[in-house]
UniProtKB/Swiss-Prot annotation:
Species this protein is from: Homarus americanus
Family statement drawn from the similarity comment of this UniProt entry: Belongs to the tyrosinase family. Hemocyanin subfamily.
Protein name per its UniProtKB record: Pseudohemocyanin-2
Gene name as annotated: phc-2
Tissue: Strongly expressed in ovaries. Also expressed in heart. Not detected in hepatopancreas, gills, connective tissue or muscle.
Main function: Does not function as a hemocyanin.
Pfam families given in the database record: Hemocyanin_C, Hemocyanin_M, Hemocyanin_N
Single GO molecular function: oxidoreductase activity
Amino acid sequence: VLLCSLVAATAAWPYFGGFQRDEPDGVPTAQKQHDINFLLHKLYEPLHEANLKALEDSFDPLAHTANMPDGGVAVNKLMQEVKTQHLEERHHWFSVFNATQREEALLLVKVLLQCQDWPTAIGNAVYFRKMMNEETYVYALYTAIKHSPLTKHVVLPPLYEIMPHFFTSSEVIQQAYRAKLIEKPGRFNMNFTGTQNNPEHKIAYFGEDIGLSTHYINWHIEYPFWWNETFGYQIERRGENYFWVHHQLVNRFEAERISNHLQKIEKLHWERNLHEGFDPHTSYKNGNPFPFRHDDIHIEDVDKVAEVRDMIVMENRIRDAIAHGYVIDKEGNKVDINNEHGIDILGDIIESCVYNPYNEYYGSLHNMGHMMLGHQGDPHAKYYDTPSVLEHYETALRDPAFYKLHKYIDDLFRKHKDHLKPYSQEDLLFPGVAVNMIDIDGPLETYFEDYEYSLMNAMDDKEEMIWEDSMEISAIIPRLRHKDFSFKVNIMNNNDENKLSTIRIFAWPHRDVNGVIMPFNEGRWHAIELDKFQKELIPGENTITRKSSESSVTVPDVPSLKSLHEQTEAAIAGSSELNLDEFVSATGLPNRLLIPKGNEAGVEFKLVVAVTDGVADSVNDEINLTTKFHHYGHHGVYLDKKPHGYPLDRRVPDERLFHEIPNFGETIVKVFNRDEHVYHH
């Protein structure tokens, strides 16, 4: 019976061989991408694809557990939830910060990661699509696709097209509904939240950038705080990665503020007023609005979440650990953090993730902080029961309170880093290597350009509708971009042999918003990472040119769902190969946002290039063969032995030491924005 079921499941969708096969099951990537595209197309409606609909009707999850490593434990648990009707209802909201809803999502993640072949994986994905809350399902499916070896070449469609309500103003959604009602295609311009009367409106282009929000949720999908080894492998240096991604967001936000003549972020204080309010102007798919928050509110206890004093207690315990140089684990042992690995432990504690050595004692400062601030508009749930934008990774970056919270957390990390011994000259030297010259080829200039994305998934359609019949309804929003440029670095290798080098490029605002030059030790903490890559240096002079588009810090825009569909169907039809590998990793920043906006007068930045020993830096020899030295790592493995931000991550008591290191170089550059806007009509 089991064999017959497997054959039936496999026969329910066509098999196309010959191109871009995945390991270990040999099913073409094009087939997998096709299936995922249709699972997410019209997410809130029944499946529209005939083969998947047939599979939905015939697949029995309990009949396909023989090859699962856990013997079907995860499937049985999820099926029991289905049978007892304990799953979250459809058309309801979902937040990963809600423990009950999160556990439900993890049941599906476990089921999908237990699948050892594509027929079983897609069968389960199809079956549970109709059983689960739509947003829970998307979170679980995206996470499983990111971590399963079966889907290593599958591209996750952009979430702003899968769940447009999270990224699109209610006003535009209403315009789209009206266009759909009268069956007239439409393209609708969307404005950023707030008005000119709100100073924060000047930088809404950054926090509300849909690509930046996609980066943020993709990072959290790649490095979920709930992850442990039972899901397949351990994620290395997860806590340090958590520190770095948020440190960079804060630093980039600060650089954008300087570009717009705004004062620096004031960090959060639990016992002071929260000055910045926020009205997101967005609604859930079921019509419930995202809660708003007034200006100048006193931070209150939040019912069923936490009290303000709880947050202060957590903070003080973390401060004590930093001051003493150790944390306490569950057995009462002292775990030293005054070393290069301490940042990893501290990050695990602050978030807090499963690797937290003593969660019951240190609590969850970050996650609880998001929930506390998110409920300040209605702390006693008198008017809302829906989560705020701060309780969704897709929307959190839009709220100014996000940056106040993370400035406050970043200050804790800095206190820890400042406790560490500064780097010595020996720590920093790359013997025989010197940076002679740093230059920029091309303009450091930014501009805004209109971007269009589909609202198709926000609209309801008839069940018999086919993809090609979908009406073109879309939103248009301006996005920051920069003109192409290249870094040019002249490096002298005075050794008699080739040397593998790691080239690390950073920049920080040369002056604060008041025009005062930042001291070196202050500037280096505000540095934004622009690139990190490896290069073989021949003996003698080496002139290295690195295009801005090649930066390992950034990734290109993922193709639209329509484009993914068209490319996939063309590959299946045999007219072209499906080659989407450049879009598989979506954890980097959008390549449009590599440099800050700047302004018409030009914003000065100190550009620092550090050339370090590539052999000593690399985790293994395989990295030497890669062209993408990605700083977030891959599949739980971080590829660089050095700490994030090295060599700028530790305090510099005397900047003269830094200037005397021959393998480091620096210069001053200016970034311009001349109010250029490229419109698409």
